[in-house]
Each structure stands twice: as structure tokens, then as C-alpha cells.
Amino acid sequence: MSLTEEIKKRRTFAIISHPDAGKTTITEQLLYFGGEIREAGTVKGKKSGTFAKSDWMDIEKQRGISVTSSVMQFDYAGKRVNILDTPGHEDFSEDTYRTLMAVDAAVMVVDSAKGIEAQTKKLFEVVKHRNIPVFTFINKLDRDGREPLELLEELEEVLGIASYPMNWPIGMGRAFEGLYDLHNKRLELYKGDERFASIEDGDQLFANNPFYEQVKEDIELLQEAGNVFSEQAILDGDLTPVFFGSALTNFGVQTFLDTFLEFAPEPHGHKTTEGNVVDPLAKDFSGFVFKIQANMDPKHRDRIAFVRIVSGEFERGMGVNLTRTGKGAKLSNVTQFMAESRENVTNAVAGDIIGVYDTGTYQVGDTLTVGKNKFEFEPLPTFTPEIFMKVSPKNVMKQKSFHKGIEQLVQEGAIQLYKNYQTGEYMLGAVGQLQFEVFKHRMEGEYNAEVVMTPMGKKTVRWISEDDLDQRMSSSRNILAKDRFDQPVFLFENDFALRWFADKYPDVTLEEKM
């Protein structure tokens, strides 16, 4: 098969949702259809000892939540599918946002009882900003939920995107009978031995069933007043196809997968800092690091840099340029993943995600190129932390482990590090409290370094240029610090302290990140 044909087979997408909407369960079912797991186990198997395939970190297994993005790959129906399962927990939005830079489409999982929740809305805004296609799976039809028309209306109003139902539920909860499949023009049956039936048989199958009569009325209304189906509108991110189903009972999931692969886009190009778009079908290899993860295998204390291949083909042992440093690197020890299990890979193409063993060479956002090509892709988003803690080693004899742990976890982007300009004291910044808990857990479990953490509360963060810097500007209400790149930064006690500073030093430019 030619390189172009290989690249056109790729489908790379992320699954996004609010916590507990069923995101990891649907991931399990997709892997089951891809033949990667023998049984799709329910995710929160804390008592049974069975854990989700994509929740590999110790703390994830204890809590039944995803706190890191997992990368999984399988072949299905002539396509090579790359799934990135992202953390649903709001504190880990940084990791999720960066992951969304590495995909060509997103699958949004919605709980039918709860509709569009806060985290879903937040993540959708990032996806919308990138204009990538969004496919919606409304989950948990095996339980009682809200009316389908109400859910579609909320989706359109809250997210500001047009929707088109690909199927429609016949009842829900205990009265759930199946799906009226508008796209494939058939009925998908929840009960009995037969999985499908023709629409012509519907009146006989569901004689005297008020839910089926309601479905026919709903569909008539949608056909008269609903949106027109358009493949181009889907690819432009203007229309989301909506699928109903139940991930837990594996109902409607395979139909979703088949239809998703029919309409999901091939790998797309990425913009460089100069505004050019790198074509995925170009023969020269290029890619960018969107995530770094330490200790995926605690026995080996390893670090993996996750690279999205943007163009061309990776071959084992190839030399690449690391644009940020201007130095070369050799990609000899490279893996692909099924959550924590992995296999060495000898070649991969645009659209694929590979893991490069890293001894500290790479940073999140790095661009890799070959030959004379030395461009950089657009930077990944960075986020301004909102809450802070001072951190120090509990045991002074463990300084080495403490520094190694902090360095690796900061390079992962799991937490942000600041040093007090005057005292050199370490301060950690996070988007939410759970990030601190995970940091402490990993420092103790993976680096054998107990830490003392002292809350500093919320701070308003602003960056300042070296030229404007005067250490006398610092006070107890605005702490002067350096970020991990040695850029000066002020941590203001509150918005009032920020305004007071701005009034006192009107010529000083204060910069805010996302």
C-alpha cells in the first residue's frame, strides 16, 4: 500500500465528556469491537479488581476517574483508528486541551439524564475554536433520561451548533425498546434475538406501543423543521451528528462506530508559526509533542513523549531536528499504545500517535522535522493557574528524589512550578485542587519523596518582561517569582492588588495567559 493510501486510512479522535457521562465505558466498547480487549468491562470495577483498560495510573484505578489522557490504537473496517481518551475531571482540562490539538475529530459523550454539563461545554469551546468535527453520543438510554427533543434543543442552544439525529430512541429506561435508525433506514432492537428489523416491520413489532407512536411523530417533526444533513457541514464543525445508545449494555455503539468512520475526516494539516499549513501527504516526516508522561511503567521509571505525526512517515532509527534547540535527535526507541501496554513500532504515518522514550530532551509543544525543514508548529495552549501551594521535601535527605520528581511532573505539564524571586522557595500552581492531590500521590508513590504542601490560596497571575522588572515592585500582596522558563511573573493576592499595581506602575505591561 502506498504512503498516501496508508495516511488516508487513519482516523484520529478524542473522546470528551463531563465526569461520569460514560466516556471510558464507550472507549472500552470501541476497543472491544476493534478486537483489542476480549471483554469490555464496566469501568468502576474498584471492588471486583477489574479496571478500565484506559485507566492505567494507580490513582485512577483507586478512584475510578481518568486523570491523564490515554492513547489507544486498533484496526477496524479497513481503517486504522487512534483514540485519545481524555480526563473528564475538570482539574485536568490542561491535559485535555493539549490532547485536542493532536486530533482530527472529537466524540462528545452526553448523559441522557443530565444533558450538557459544565465540563462538556468548556471542552466543546476548545473543539469549536479549532473547527474540528464533533460527533455526539447521547448515552445511558438503559436508564430514564430527558426527552430526546429537549436534549437536542439544549445541545443547540448551549453549544451553538446545529444537530442532526442519526437515530432516535424508542422509549428509555425500563421501557427502552431500541433505536429508529434514520441514517441506515432500519430498526435496531434492544430485546429479543434479532438485532435489526426493517422499518416496514415496525408497526407490527411495536403494535399498541405508545413510545413507537411518539417516535414516528418526533421523526415527522424533525423532517419538517429539523436541520438538513450535510457532510460538509459536519467536516466544517458546523453540524454535529447525534447518536443515541447505551455504552454500558453495548447497544448502539457499533452502529455509531460504523457511521463515525464513514464520515470522520482523514488526517489534516497543521499550521506553522509562519502561517503555512503542512500537508499530511507530504513525504517528509514532521510532528509535535503534545504530552509527556513519566512513569507509565513504574518498574522502569521511564518518560514518554507523545508525538502526533503531522506529515510523512516515521521509520525506526530516523534522525530528526528538534527545532526549539536546533539540535538533532534519533528516534530509535519508539512505541505505540494500548493504555499502559505497549509495543515497539518500526514505522507509523501522518495521523498516528507515537511514544518516544525521553531522557529529558523533549518539552510539550516541541516540533520535530527532518532534513532542511526547520519550521515550528503553532504553540499549544498554556494555562494560568488559579490556586497555589508552597512545596518542600519532608526529608532533607531526599532532596535528589524531590527535585527529580518535580522536574519530571512539571515537564509533563501535570502542574506548574514557580520559584520565589527572593527566597528561591518552590511554589506550585494548578487549575484545580485534584492536581495537587495527584502530584503528592505521585511524588510519594513514584519518586519515594514525601512532600510538605502549604496552601497559599488563590492568586491572580501576570507575566512581566525583564526590561520592566524592578525587584522593589514586590510586596506581600504581589509575590515576584520565576516560572519554569525563568520568566518573571507576579502572583497577586487578588484583583484589587492587581489593579492597585497597575495604577502605581502604568508603564509596566502585565501579560495574561489562557
UniProtKB/Swiss-Prot annotation:
Residues passing through the membrane, by range: none
GO terms of biological process kind: regulation of translational termination
PROSITE patterns xrefs: G_TR_1, G_TR_2
Positions annotated to bind GTP: 17-24, 85-89, 139-142
Primary localization: cytoplasm
Keywords: Cytoplasm, GTP-binding, Nucleotide-binding, Protein biosynthesis
A GO molecular-function descriptor: translation release factor activity, codon nonspecific
InterPro entries per the UniProt record, alphabetical: EF-G-like_DII, EFG_III/V, G_TR_CS, P-loop_NTPase, PrfC, RF3_C, RF3_dom_3_sf, RF3_GTP-bd
Cell compartments where the protein resides: Cytoplasm
GO CC annotation: cytosol
Residue span(s) of domain tr-type G: 8-268
Function according to Swiss-Prot or TrEMBL: Increases the formation of ribosomal termination complexes and stimulates activities of RF-1 and RF-2. It binds guanine nucleotides and has strong preference for UGA stop codons. It may interact directly with the ribosome. The stimulation of RF-1 and RF-2 is significantly reduced by GTP and GDP, but not by GMP.
Cited NCBIfam families: prfC (TIGR00503), PRK00741.1 (NF001964), small_GTP (TIGR00231)
Family stated for the protein in its record: Belongs to the TRAFAC class translation factor GTPase superfamily. Classic translation factor GTPase family. PrfC subfamily.
Entry-linked HAMAP family: Rel_fac_3
Protein name from the UniProt record: Peptide chain release factor 3
